[in-house]
């Protein structure tokens, strides 16, 4: 259902730039699951896109100290010098990328970074190449900014990764950006240096195309996978690459709302113009906390990633043991993206035929009280996403319920 359909009854006519944007399937499922919980039903919600760990104590203490120092006023528009220096050092230390402070921007979450970049660069009809499955906001942000999302299906047969052949075929004179996310939400797929190389070679041939990389799940990778970011791999693309990151996932700071990016000075300046007329500066207290996160101890990241890996293994093994489901092993993030084509056309105990991944997920919620998200919400069917950012006990119970639900299909 689109925005137009939901608000016209109230006599309000939405702007055309948002009229085609639908209400998030994730939000609808979450609302239904929450309502069922309020009714006393034992719902297990596996849709959360945030870590279940707490923000580290030293980060919380830094925020408290900032408050007591009176650092509760406006800051510089796109980030304090202290935070920009911490980000610069992080990029150099962990990614081998060198940026000046005026090539770094800070915003109220990585989502605002993406919005600022698209708003600052897209003219009506400009195209943005987005591999599917994709994080749901990518396409909507492009549309709000009057760009045209070019969605390229990348299913399990390609490891949910874009290929050079598909990228080359998608590029036109109107292409402005290619958007890549590694590790990916929702698939958990990640690009190695070898995976990136053919894509970067394609981009080198098309100097009018810029690259936006979302590295938010950088620190959550498994099985000795070596994370790498494209601007390091190909210096020839650095002057048209925006490298996006944030503190939300690695440091369990989703509610602190700090995202950041490094990129060409002219783009960063244009993004600041957009931000100046939107939110102005990010939260001063959150910025102080983020300095502590980036500059402070990082050893806890390994322990948390090991915990996520145990859960990943539990979920992947459990799903692959269920007839009709097929789950690829993700390289990172905290999601599985399982195929469910094997249950298509089967019939539920109530007599409803499963025609889509949306039907399957609705069945799991209503029949077994397990909330997962259909692949259609991420632009690729028939799949469903599970977030394993919850306890192993809850994951085991959810897998038992999903298995039992599949056995009841005829």
UniProtKB/Swiss-Prot annotation:
Main location: cytoplasm
UniProt note: phenotype after gene disruption: Insertion mutant is prototroph and is able to carry out symbiotic nitrogen fixation.
GO cellular component: cytoplasm
Binding positions for L-aspartate per the UniProt entry: 47, 135, 185, 385
Cellular compartments annotated: Cytoplasm
Recorded effect of pH on activity: Optimum pH is 8.0-8.5.
Top-level taxonomic group: Bacteria
Glycosyltransferase in keyword set: no
Reactions mediated catalytically: L-aspartate + 2-oxoglutarate = oxaloacetate + L-glutamate
Gene Ontology terms for molecular function: L-aspartate:2-oxoglutarate aminotransferase activity; pyridoxal phosphate binding
Cofactors, names only: pyridoxal 5'-phosphate
Residues modified as N6-(pyridoxal phosphate)lysine: 249
EC number: 2.6.1.1
Pfam families xrefs: Aminotran_1_2
Family stated for the protein in its record: Belongs to the class-I pyridoxal-phosphate-dependent aminotransferase family.
Subunit structure: Homodimer.
Function, as annotated: Catalyzes the reversible conversion of aspartate and 2-oxoglutarate to glutamate and oxaloacetate.
Protein name: Aspartate aminotransferase
Origin species: Rhizobium meliloti
UniProt lineage: Bacteria, Pseudomonadati, Pseudomonadota, Alphaproteobacteria, Hyphomicrobiales
